[in-house]
C-alpha cells in the first residue's frame, strides 16, 4: 500500500455519516459489532449514529437517533444482548413507516446504514434501499426535504451483519451469537449430566431453532447425545423403535444416563411436529425409564458473549465500515460474513434467497436439498453425528481385515484432547479396527504403557478437560529401539498423535527414524492440540478456544475491579510460549489497550507511547487500562519490568497492578468449539488412517515410507487438510516453536484502532465481494 492509500483510510469517512442499528432477536456479540462500527467509523473521520430500538427507532426518529462517541461504547464488549436496544417493528413493514425513516436519515445527512440482525431484518434493509430514490422524491414533493438535501443523500449504502443465535443464515459459517448460545446450552447439559448419572435418568432437552437444527446438532456432537431431532432431517418412519433400541443398548453397555436433544422445530417425514413431551411419553411407556424434559428457552440468548463472538463481532464490524465507505451507487447491498476463518462480503439478496430456498425445500419435504443448501459445515457435522450415534458398535472380533491403530497425547494438556481421543477410538471401532491407547505420550510408547480401548472405555469423555490418557513432552528419538520393539509387540499399524508442538516435532523425528528402523514405517497423523495454537499447518489448535475464554473471563473481572477503583492499569501475562495468538486474540476479545507479543518486536519507545496513551485515556471518562503481555515476548522487557515502568511513569496519574494467569489457562471444561472441532478432527484422522493402512499393506505387512504417510491434519482457511510433516519443515521457526507465517497477525491493526491508536489501516483483512454459489462448490469446509 502506498503512503497515499495509508492516509486514505483515515480520511475515507470524512463528510460521511453512518447509522448502526440492531434489529430482530438479540444475540450475544452484537455489542462487540456496534463498538467496532462506532470506533472504526470515527477512526476514518465519519460521524456515527446509534439508532435505538431497531427499525422502530429509525421510524420514530427524535431521541432514538443519537450521535455516538468513542467513550459511549466503552465497557460494552462483555455485555450480552444489545445495549442500543432492539424491537420487532410493524411500522417499517409499511411504506409509510419507511418514508418516515428515510426522512429521519436525510435530515441528519446519513447515507450509510449498518444493520445487525437476522434474515428478516436484512431483507427489510434491502427493500428500504431499493425504494430509496422513490421515497426521496415523495418526500421532496411533500415539501419535507429540499432538493439540495435529496441530491446530497441521493443513494443509500447498506451492509448487513448477521446476528442470530440459530446460525440459520446461508452464506456464513457462523452468525454472531451462535457460539455463545452453544456455551449456554453446554453449561446446562454438563450440569444436567451429573444429576442424570446420579439417578440413572433420561433427559430430553429442547433447544432453540424453529427452522434450523444447527444448535441441536452441534450440541449433540459436543455432549455425545444418544439422539438428536432436527427439522432438516426428519427421522425414518419407525424412529420410535430405533430410538428405544438405541437407548436400551446404551444402558446395557453400562451408561447411567441418556440424553436426547430436540430442536424446537423438529418434525417427522410428514411434517408433523415431534415434541419433547411426546418423546418423554414414548420412553416412559416403552422402556420405563425415569425421564425428564428440560426446555432451555431464552437462557440461550442471555449471558456473556464468548471470546469467539466478541472477535467475530469486532472483525465483522471493521469490515462493515470499510464496505460502507467503499460503496458506490452500483455496489449491491452486502453481508459481511465468515467463511472458515476469513472475512468475506456476499451479496445480501443472494444469501437471503438461499436462506428462503432452505425453508421452501423443507416445506416441500425435499429434506436432502435443505441439508445441501445449509452448506458443507452443516453436512459434515451431520455425517460425524450419524457415525458416532447411529451405527452400532461392532462386537469385538479378530479377523484378517482388522488393523491396529494406537492413539496418544503428547505435549502439555489442552481442553478437547479427550474429545479427540473419544472420536478416534469410536470411529476406529466402527470401521472394524482394533484401537489401542497409549498412556504418557512417547514415554509410554517406549515403556509399553499400552492397552486396548473398547467402546465404553471413552464414554463421557467429550466434556472432560485436560488429558485422561496422560501426556508428556518427551520426544521419541531417545527411545527408538524400545518404541520399535513395542510397535512390533503390539502389532501397531498406525499412530494418531494428539498434541502440541512436541507432537509435530515427534512426527518429524519418526520420519527421520524410518531410515534406521523399519518398524517406524507406519502411517501417522498429528492432530494439533495446544493452548498456544503454534502448530505449523493449522490455523487453529484444539484447546486454544478454551484457553481464550478463560483469559477473557479473567480480564472481564479484572476490568470490573479497575472500573471500581478508577485510574488503574492492569498488566496481564498470558501463556503461549513465543506464540502471541492468545495475547492478541484475548486483547481483541477483552478490549485491551495493548498486547505485547514476540512476533511484533517492540522497543522502549513503544512502551513509552503506550504509557502516554494511557495518561491521555485517564483524562476521559474511561479511567482504567488493560495491557496483555505474552510470556516470552521479550526476555528483557519482562512483566515485572513493564509493571515497574508503568508504575513509575504513571505516578500521580494512575497506579498499576500485575497478574500472571499461569496454568489456569490449560484447565477447565472444553468449550463447544473445542469439543466439536476435536470430534471432527478425530473422525477425519481415523478415516484417513484406515485408507492409508490399506494403501501401505504389502506382502502381509504394513510398510509406509512416503512423505504423505506422516501428516499434520490442520484447518487452513476454509478446509481441513492433511499436510506431510516434511513439507511443513520449511514453514517452521524451530528456535521459537512457531510457524513462520501466522494468519492472525493481520488482525493486530484492528486491536490497535479499537484502542484508539493513530495507525495505518493497511494490513486488515481485505474482503472482496464473492458469490454464494461459487463459495458452496469450493473446498470441503469443516
From Swiss-Prot:
Keywords: Acetylation, Allosteric enzyme, ATP-binding, Cytoplasm, Glycolysis, Glycoprotein, Hydroxylation, Kinase, Magnesium, Metal-binding, Nucleotide-binding, Phosphoprotein, Transferase
Required cofactor(s): Mg(2+)
Positions of the catalytic residues: 166 (proton acceptor)
Database matches in Gene3D superfamilies: 3.40.50.450, Phosphofructokinase domain
Post-translational modification: GlcNAcylation decreases enzyme activity.
Pfam families given in the database record: PFK
Pathway: Carbohydrate degradation; glycolysis; D-glyceraldehyde 3-phosphate and glycerone phosphate from D-glucose: step 3/4
Residue positions binding substrate: 164-166, 201, 208-210, 264, 292, 298-301
Positions bearing N6-(2-hydroxyisobutyryl)lysine: 559
Residue list for modification Phosphoserine: 133, 377, 669, 777
Location in the cell: Cytoplasm
Quaternary context: Homo- and heterotetramers. Phosphofructokinase (PFK) enzyme functions as a tetramer composed of different combinations of 3 types of subunits, called PFKM (M), PFKL (L) and PFKP (P). The composition of the PFK tetramer differs according to the tissue type it is present in. The kinetic and regulatory properties of the tetrameric enzyme are dependent on the subunit composition, hence can vary across tissues. Interacts (via C-terminus) with HK1 (via N-terminal spermatogenic cell-specific region).
UniProt function note: Catalyzes the phosphorylation of D-fructose 6-phosphate to fructose 1,6-bisphosphate by ATP, the first committing step of glycolysis.
Family: Belongs to the phosphofructokinase type A (PFKA) family. ATP-dependent PFK group I subfamily. Eukaryotic two domain clade 'E' sub-subfamily.
Protein's name according to its UniProt entry: ATP-dependent 6-phosphofructokinase, muscle type
Amino acid at each position: 500500500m502506498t503512503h497515499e492509500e495509508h492516509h486514505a483510510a483515515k480520511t475515507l469517512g470524512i463528510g460521511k455519516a453512518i447509522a448502526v442499528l440492531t434489529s430482530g432477536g438479540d444475540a450475544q456479540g452484537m455489542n462487540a459489532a456496534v463498538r467496532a462500527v462506532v470506533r472504526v467509523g470515527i477512526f476514518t473521520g465519519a460521524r456515527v449514529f446509534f439508532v435505538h430500538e431497531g427499525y422502530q427507532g429509525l421510524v420514530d426518529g427524535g431521541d432514538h437517533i443519537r450521535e455516538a462517541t468513542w467513550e459511549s461504547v466503552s465497557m460494552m464488549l462483555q455485555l450480552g444482548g444489545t445495549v442500543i436496544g432492539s424491537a420487532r417493528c410493524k411500522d417499517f413493514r409499511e411504506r409509510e413507516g419507511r418514508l418516515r425513516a428515510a426522512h429521519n436519515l436525510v435530515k441528519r445527512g446519513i447515507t450509510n446504514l449498518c444493520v445487525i440482525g437476522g434474515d428478516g431484518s436484512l431483507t427489510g434493509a434491502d427493500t428500504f434501499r431499493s425504494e430509496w430514490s422513490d421515497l426521496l422524491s415523495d418526500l421532496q414533493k411533500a415539501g419535507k426535504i429540499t432538493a439540495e438535501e435529496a441530491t446530497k443523500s441521493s443513494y443509500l449504502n447498506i451492509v448487513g451483519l448477521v446476528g442470530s443465535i440459530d446460525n440459520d443464515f446461508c452464506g456464513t459459517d457462523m452468525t454472531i451469537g451462535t457460539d455463545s448460545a452453544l456455551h449456554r446450552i453446554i453449561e446446562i447439559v454438563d450440569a444436567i449430566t451429573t444429576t442424570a448419572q446420579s439417578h440413572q435418568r433420561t433427559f430430553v432437552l429442547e433447544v432453540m431453532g424453529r427452522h434450523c437444527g444447527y444448535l441441536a446438532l452441534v450440541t449433540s456432537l459436543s455432549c455425545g447425545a444418544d439422539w438428536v431431532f432436527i427439522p432438516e432431517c426428519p427421522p425414518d418412519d419407525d424412529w420410535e423403535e430405533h430410538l428405544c433400541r438405541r437407548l436400551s443398548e446404551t444402558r446395557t453397555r453400562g451408561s447411567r444416563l441418556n440424553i436426547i436433544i430436540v430442536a424446537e422445530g423438529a418434525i417427522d417425514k410428514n411434517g408433523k411436529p415431534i415434541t419433547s413431551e411426546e418423546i418423554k411419553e414414548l420412553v416412559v411407556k416403552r422402556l420405563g425409564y425415569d425421564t425428564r424434559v428440560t426446555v432451555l428457552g431464552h437462557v440461550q440468548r442471555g449471558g456473556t458473549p464468548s471470546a469467539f463472538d466478541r472477535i467475530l463481532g469486532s472483525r465483522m464490524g471493521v469490515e462493515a465500515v470499510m464496505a460502507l465507505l467503499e460503496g458506490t451507487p452500483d455496489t449491491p447491498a452486502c453481508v459481511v460474513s465468515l467463511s472458515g476463518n476469513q472475512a468475506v462480503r456476499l451479496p445480501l439478496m443472494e444469501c437471503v434467497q438461499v436462506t428462503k430456498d432452505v425453508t421452501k425445500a423443507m416445506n416441500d419435504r425435499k429434506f436432502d436439498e435443505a441439508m445441501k443448501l445449509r452448506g458443507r459445515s452443516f453436512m459434515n457435522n451431520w455425517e460425524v453425528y450419524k457415525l458416532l450415534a447411529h451405527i452400532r458398535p461392532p462386537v469385538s472380533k479378530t479377523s484378517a481385515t482388522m488393523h491396529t491403530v494406537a492413539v496418544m497425547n503428547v505435549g502439555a494438556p489442552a481442553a478437547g484432547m479427550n474429545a479427540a481421543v473419544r472420536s478416534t477410538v469410536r470411529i476406529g471401532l466402527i470401521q472394524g479396527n482394533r484401537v489401542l491407547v497409549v498412556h504418557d505420550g512417547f514415554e509410554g510408547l517406549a515403556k509399553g504403557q499400552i492397552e486396548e480401548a473398547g467402546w465404553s472405555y471413552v464414554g463421557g469423555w467429550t466434556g472432560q478437560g485436560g488429558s485422561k490418557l496422560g501426556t508428556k513432552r518427551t520426544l521419541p528419538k531417545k527411545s527408538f529401539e524400545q518404541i520399535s520393539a513395542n510397535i512390533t509387540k503390539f502389532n501397531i499399524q498406525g499412530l494418531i498423535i494428539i498434541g502440541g508442538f512436541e507432537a509435530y516435532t515427534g512426527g518429524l523425528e519418526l520420519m527421520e527414524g524410518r531410515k534406521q528402523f523399519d518398524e517406524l514405517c507406519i502411517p501417522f497423523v498429528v492432530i494439533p492440540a495446544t493452548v498456544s495454537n503454534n502448530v505449523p499447518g493449522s490455523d487453529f489448535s484444539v484447546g486454544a478456544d478454551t484457553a481464550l475464554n478463560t483469559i477473557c473471563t479473567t480480564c472481564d473481572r479484572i476490568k470490573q475491579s479497575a472500573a471500581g477503583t478508577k485510574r488503574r492499569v492492569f498488566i496481564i501475562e498470558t501463556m503461549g510460549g513465543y506464540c502471541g495468538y492468545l495475547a492478541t486474540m484475548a486483547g481483541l476479545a477483552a478490549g485491551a489497550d495493548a498486547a505485547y507479543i514476540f512476533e511484533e518486536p517492540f522497543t522502549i519507545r513503544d512502551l513509552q507511547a503506550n504509557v502516554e496513551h494511557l495518561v491521555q485515556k485517564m483524562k476521559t471518562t474511561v479511567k482504567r487500562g488493560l495491557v496483555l503481555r505474552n510470556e516470552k515476548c521479550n526476555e528483557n522487557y519482562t512483566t515485572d519490568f513493564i509493571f515497574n515502568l508503568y508504575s513509575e511513569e504513571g505516578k500521580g496519574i494512575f497506579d498499576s497492578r500485575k497478574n500472571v494467569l499461569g496454568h489456569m489457562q490449560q484447565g477447565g471444561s472444553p468449550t463447544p468449539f473445542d469439543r466439536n472441532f476435536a470430534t471432527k478432527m478425530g473422525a477425519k484422522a481415523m478415516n484417513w488412517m484406515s485408507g492409508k493402512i490399506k494403501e501401505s499393506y504389502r506382502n502381509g505387512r504394513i510398510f509406509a515410507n512416503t512423505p504423505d504417510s506422516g501428516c499434520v491434519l490442520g484447518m487452513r482457511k476454509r478446509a481441513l487438510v492433511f499436510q506431510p510433516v516434511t513439507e511443513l519443515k520449511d514453514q517452521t521457526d524451530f528456535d521459537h516453536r512457531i510457524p513462520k507465517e501466522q494468519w492472525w497477525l493481520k488482525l493486530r491493526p484492528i486491536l490497535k484502532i479499537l484502542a484508539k491508536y493513530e495507525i495505518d489501516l493497511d494490513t486488515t483483512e481485505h474482503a472482496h465481494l464473492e458469490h454464494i454459489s461459487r463459495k458452496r462448490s469450493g473446498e470441503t469446509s469443516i
